[in-house]
Amino acid sequence: MIDMLLKKLIKSLPKKKNIRVQGLSINSKKIKKGYIFFAIKGKNFDGEKYIDEAVKKGAIAIVCSKKCQYKHELIPIIKTNNPRYFLSKVCSKFFRFKPKNIIAVTGTNGKTSVADLFYQILSLNNKPVASIGTLGIKYKKNNLKTNLTSPDTINLHQALENIKKNKIENVIIEASSHGLHQRRIDHLNIKAGIFTNFSQDHLDYHKSMQSYLKAKLHLFKNILLKNKAVISDKSLKEFITLKKISKQKRLRLIEINKIEKKLKKNNKIKSLNKFQLKNLSMAILAAKICNVNEKNIFRILHKIKGVSGRLELVRVFPNNIKVFVDFAHTPDALLKTIIALKAQNKNKISIVFGCGGDRDKKKRPLMAKIVKEHCEKIYVTDDNPRNEKPGKIRQEILSNLKKDNSHNIENRANAIRTAIKNASPNEVILIAGKGHETEQ
């Protein structure tokens, strides 16, 4: 068990408070004797309502907002303007050991692909590597599933320390907009930040595109330190902003153009679709920053595998009906995926898709418009409805489609079976939205 003097973690405490810290938690139910409880206000829960429970379970200090009214004669109450920021600062001291080369990748789409490709490149070059993101926390033979793209602050720092203890110095983290906004990635010594792209998503949380972009740019504006690297695509509209930030903060801006051109001339990459070349370019540049030689990278490219659930060909039937699976759950990703399929398949494309509940509702008509324009048969089904009524979500999509080629099928498995049953020889079926996920 890691323990540390409280005054070493939190300098603002009176010097007489020589209390041993055994752990940190944002969940009152997980508090044990000797833990600090961070009473954080979230979307669904207010941590300040659970301070009493944390104290009864043995919390030795409470961190909360300046507005918090809680008082205790024996336990220090540390009030701060931003408890989330304060948590990441304390975590960086409590979990002291971190890998030398930490790469963070953000953007609307492509984070998981970049992370997976980076992991493959380093593994194939016999460099110990880890990845943290949508596919879980992966290193050596460990693959721990997580519910979040970016784990909560404590779990993230703890995971990084475990990775370091396993003698791994290279790690890539998927930095989601939620994770960045909630300061989960603050106070990490990140060697390079990758910006993949930017399009509409998560407006249920961020409320506007400006706020959403601001969250993404937090990585470059506030987390990356002087002389660290920024990797991005020159053709993006946001590249100009990244250039300004890089100049102001004296960051090294690296664009993918040269590497991407080399990849287009390379005939050895068989398992990746053309639209993955940008993601591969970013992964290669990140690998180079981790001291992997470019020649050695290009030597192993023929061994690179497609990313699980990213335009993955999962089945070919005897009559040449092809079934692809993709994680596309934003208008931009869906359009790019369909266009990529059209480029390599001259045949009709049918789609099975839905939209997630309790998420950006403005995406639904936009995604309907895309499939209406590009797909022959459309099977609208459920996709993680969460707390919304599934039928209502499907109806919002269907109201933007033609009746003669769209089908409303509640059960996802039935929708897939129906699409395959109704398919003509040589037809392409795209199952979009869930990618690698196996549960609803």
List the model feature ranges, each with a label:
Residues 1-89, 93, 237, 241, ...:
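N-terminal leader/targeting and accessory segments in enzymes
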Residues 1-18, 30-36, 42, 49, ...:
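ATP-dependent carboxylate-amine ligase
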Residues 6-7, 64-73, 164-175, 179-182, ...:
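Acidic, Mg2+-coordinating active-site environments of NTP-dependent enzymes
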Residues 35, 54, 90, 105, ...:
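Residue-level signal for inorganic ion chemistry
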Residues 51-56, 164, 186, 342:
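Non-catalytic positions within long, well-ordered alpha-helices that form the structural scaffold/packing
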Residues 60-66, 194, 229-234, 352-354, ...:
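Short internal beta-strands
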Residues 91-136, 142:
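Walker A (P-loop) phosphate-binding motif
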Residues 133-155, 159:
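P-loop NTPase switch/communication element
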